[in-house]
Design a protein with these regions (language model features):
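NTP-binding/hydrolysis catalytic cores, primarily Walker-type P-loop NTPases
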Residues: 1-9, 301-394
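N-terminal anchoring/assembly modules that precede and organize ATP-driven motor systems
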Residues: 1-48
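Active-site phosphate-binding and catalytic loops of NTP-dependent enzymes
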Residues: 11-18, 64-81, 167, 266-273, ...
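P-loop NTP-binding catalytic core
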Residues: 22, 39, 45-138
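Switch/coupling sub-region of P-loop NTPases
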Residues: 129, 139-142, 154, 158-282, ...
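The Walker A (P-loop) glycine that initiates the GxxxxGKT/S ATP-binding motif of P-loop NTPases
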Residues: 146
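Conserved glycine(s) of the Walker
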Residues: 151
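Phosphate-binding/switch region of NTP-binding enzymes
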Residues: 274-310
Length: 394
């Protein structure tokens, strides 16, 4: 199959072959034959590459579909697939795509990042990284939240690599993107239905149910975006501590609300209040990943979900957050740092009992941050704040 794919690249994807082979390009976006954009270092640029016409672009996409055993035509106008080289591709053809065949190729990264790499990139501080390492070691359930392209999968890869090698991991994804190094790991991937071949679909929810019967120590779901959220919550609440997943949301509080909404999408009817309590109980640590306007991907918040307040709102306390302090105009990059917010997690005693080297002083915010936050604290105390519980801890 790989040779068919390579032949398809040589024959049909000549106009973008240099982009596919350029390691600095992370994503290729085709908006019809004459308009191609690429993402480099988190920023999007217009490329000079072009296809000769719509017919040649569609021919290229049909060849790609064929190389992965799929069809894209008027009856099947959308293609979502993983290519043999690991890249993800999504295609929509006319008339659904009015400006011409539209394609997004997210290239597979051969580079396996570590926490040290994220520290070197400025995505997270050494103390915050060490704290996350401890959370993994202690078996805390972790939800990685963020928008598209914010680095959620990379973070999940990094955290998964810190799981003790003696534990059995079951990893479930729509398309294989995670590359977690472990001695005892099993990968599952969903399958789309193909009525022409009498092939039924296998969903993430199906695989979560199977995973629970395969004696996992931890279950990792690459992306939670449907009714399988309820199954993951139940996994986390029934003895499989240290499980992880990602979700699309903009803040720690929003990530909990998003999970709650996804849980309610299924056929199992559970009262919303009960779902909310289950989510609050399961989600212990939330790692919020964000992509900033300078192209940088950073951990904007590390928060602990400690329950629900008297009004039924999720209580998420920031432990660390990234704060912008300036801008490097020469390089167009934001300047900032990850700072502790002054909140000590409820499981700090576990850190002490396990003799993990992380003193309470690591949670004390710097003076400049405290002074910066004093006006906000005063406003909130006077009842004029916005009530964002994820920021109240600061």
């Amino acid at each position: 199959m790989a040779s068919v794919f390579e032949d398809a690249i040589d024959t049909f994807l000549g106009p973008i072959k240099d982009l596919l082979e350029n390691d600095k390009v992370s994503e290729i976006m085709i908006n019809g034959p004459g308009e191609i954009f690429v993402e480099k270092s988190g920023l999007v640029f217009k490329a000079s590459n072009k296809f000769s016409d719509e017919e040649s672009l569609q021919a290229a996409m049909r060849a790609i579909a064929q190389s992965v055993g799929r069809i894209i035509d008027s009856n099947n106008p959308r293609l979502d697939a993983r290519l043999p080289n690991g890249s993800r591709i999504h295609v929509v053809i006319p008339p659904m795509a009015r400006q011409g065949t539209t394609v997004a190729i997210r290239k597979f990264s051969k580079e396996k990042l570590t926490l040290k790499d994220l520290i070197a990139f400025g995505s997270i501080s050494a103390d915050a990284a060490r704290f996350l390492d401890i959370c993994v070691h202690l078996g805390k359930n972790i939800l990685v939240s963020g928008g598209t392209g914010s680095g959620k999968t990379s973070m999940l890869n990094v955290l998964g690599a810190r799981i003790p090698k003696t534990q059995r991991l079951l990893i479930i994804e729509d398309s294989n993107e995670l590359q977690i190094k472990a001695d005892h790991v099993v990968y599952f991937e969903t399958r789309q239905a193909d009525p022409t071949k009498n092939i039924t679909s296998v969903s993430i929810r199906d695989l979560v149910i199977s995973a629970m019967r395969l004696r996992p120590d931890r279950i990792i779901v690459g992306e939670v975006r449907g009714e399988e959220a309820l199954d993951l919550i139940q996994v986390m609440n029934t003895g499989h501590s240290g499980s992880m997943g990602t979700v699309h949301a903009n803040t720690p509080v929003d990530s909990c609300t998003r999970l709650e909404t996804l849980c309610l999408m299924g056929d199992i009817k559970i009262p919303p209040d009960a779902i909310r309590k289950m989510v609050a109980s399961a989600m212990q640590i939330i790692v919020q990943c964000s992509r900033y306007h300078d192209g940088g991907r950073r951990v904007s918040h590390i928060s602990e979900c400690i329950g629900i307040d008297q009004f039924g709102r999720y209580l998420c306390k920031d432990i660390y957050r990234w704060v912008q302090t300036g801008k490097d105009h020469d390089h167009g990059r934001y300047v900032g740092e990850t700072v502790p917010c002054g909140y000590i997690p409820t499981f700090f005693e576990e850190i002490i009992i396990n003799k993990l080297p992380f003193p309470k002083a690591k949670f004390v915010p710097p003076d400049w941050y405290r002074k910066m936050m004093e006006p906000l604290a005063t406003t909130t105390a006077n009842g004029n704040g916005n009530g964002n519980s994820s920021k109240a801890a600061a």
